[in-house]
Amino acid sequence: MEHGEKHITIVDDQGNEQLCEVLFTFENDTFNKSYVLYYPIDAQDDDEIEIHASSFEPNENGEDGELMPIETDEEWEMIEETLNTFLAEEDEE
């Protein structure tokens, strides 16, 4: 995972792979982390899309980094606020 990627493959607990589209990535200085918001590509246009979030650390050579779970309520609140701002800006366009 690195900034600017458009698709990522998520592997669930059972080892199933799911291709997802990256909505956007951002960095947060408060938590000193990078975050990615994404959703499954196979979601239908008329279905409500479930957006997922993870933190990630790009590796040193700029290739795929490791996704990590969001750990605190404070992080979730910050992510929700960032997502709401993003969606509001998209609606204005």
Curated annotation (Swiss-Prot):
Alphabetical list of InterPro entries matching this protein = UPF0473
Report the Pfam families cross-referenced here: DUF1292
The family annotation for this protein states: Belongs to the UPF0473 family.
Which PANTHER family does the protein's record reference? UPF0473 PROTEIN CBO2561/CLC_2432, UPF0473 PROTEIN CBO2561_CLC_2432
From the Swiss-Prot or TrEMBL record, give the protein name: UPF0473 protein RBAM_024480
